[in-house]
Amino acid sequence: MAIRDSLIQVTDLKKHYNHGAIKALDGVTVDINRGDVMVVIGPSGSGKSTFLRSLNLLEQPTGGSIVFDGVDITKKKVRNADGKMVKLNIDHHRQKMGMVFQHFNLFPHMTIMDNMTLAPIQVKHMNKAEAEEKALALLDRVGLKDRAGAYPIQLSGGQKQRIAIV
């Protein structure tokens, strides 16, 4: 039997609104291993988006735990490599976790290249040349390298979706 490599462990996850009157999530438990493909399906209002947004703490869960790559990201403090308790840096974990929103937006006044390099330059403090090199490599992977100078209005819906994914 193969050993599973757990990436995300969700245990008894809850998200309640109106002081518990509305239970968007009520005891969700799931283990997602590296390489797994997971589909979340259900009718409108069943908590799919709330669950996904909770995985990277865009929604703060009411209860339960989310362990991502061995770290319980629902805790305010975690143990660092030296064994000291330090404040959790959720941005560090978000850099390893990608999400494509149902309704994604690209800045219409910016080229695809500018859209793709904005976050690496502003958030990761990457220099422009390095950010552009990485963006071109990603665009090449999804077959859109030749569209780097285009504006979002010049792309099809599917092309915009691929840009949002990379």
Regions found by a protein language model. Name each.
Residues 3-166:
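ABC family nucleotide-binding domain
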